[in-house]
């Protein structure tokens, strides 16, 4: 894997043709559109739209389906959902798949401040039917299955949120 600022195309390393591309870059700040959407498009166009590709996985968000949480974040992830279908159509001639895995809450470092705020965490759990968030390992299992084992499902935005979207009133407090 590579860590870099995906907004800077000059930083992209030259690599042999890839078979799997997983777009996992993401932020929740003033750079949401530039990183979450434009950066995802740039990486995908640079590395994934080519004959050797077998699978492209976009890491979307439940917010892309519901519009919940922060406006720029929800809009950036909504754009990823539409772009997933565009890529799926373009790589289908290579017998490749492209899907978006749209997680709800995941126990990551990015979400650590939320998990450590007892009042906020309890309020979120009150709205979460399973009363927990997904582990990183559970997310990795979904990614592996869709990237490696799946050969037919394509162009799909798969909502994996433990039914959080069932509570459409979920908005982060200001």
What positions do the PLM features span?
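Conserved NAD(P)H cofactor-binding loop of Rossmann-fold oxidoreductase domains
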Residues: 24-28, 163
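Catalytic loop of short-chain dehydrogenase/reductase
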Residues: 55-79, 84-93, 105-106
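Short, small/polar-rich loop/turn modules that mediate ligand/substrate recognition or access, typified
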Residues: 92, 97, 153-156
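Short, flexible catalytic-loop segment of classical short-chain dehydrogenase/reductase
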Residues: 102-113
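Catalytic Tyr-x(3-8)-Lys segment
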Residues: 118-137
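C-terminal substrate-recognition "lid" of short-chain dehydrogenase/reductases
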Residues: 132-160
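Short C-terminal tail/terminal secondary-structure segment
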Residues: 154-174
């Amino acid at each position: 894997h590579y860590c870099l600022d995906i907004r800077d195309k000059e930083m992209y390393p030259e690599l042999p043709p890839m078979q799997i591309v997983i777009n996992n870059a993401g932020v929740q700040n003033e750079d949401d559109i530039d990183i979450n959407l434009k950066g995802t498009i740039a990486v995908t166009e640079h590395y994934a739209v080519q004959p050797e590709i077998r699978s492209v996985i976009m890491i979307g968000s439940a917010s892309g389906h519901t519009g919940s949480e922060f406006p720029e974040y929800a809009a950036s992830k909504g754009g990823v959902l539409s772009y997933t279908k565009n890529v799926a159509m373009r790589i289908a001639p290579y017998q490749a798949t492209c899907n978006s895995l749209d997680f709800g809450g995941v126990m990551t470092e990015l979400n650590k401040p939320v998990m450590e705020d007892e009042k906020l965490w309890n309020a979120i759990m009150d709205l979460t039917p399973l009363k927990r968030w997904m582990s990183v390992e559970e997310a990795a299992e979904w990614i592996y299955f869709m990237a490696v084992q799946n050969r037919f499902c394509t162009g799909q935005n798969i909502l994996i949120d433990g039914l959080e979207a069932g509570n459409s009133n979920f908005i982060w407090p200001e």
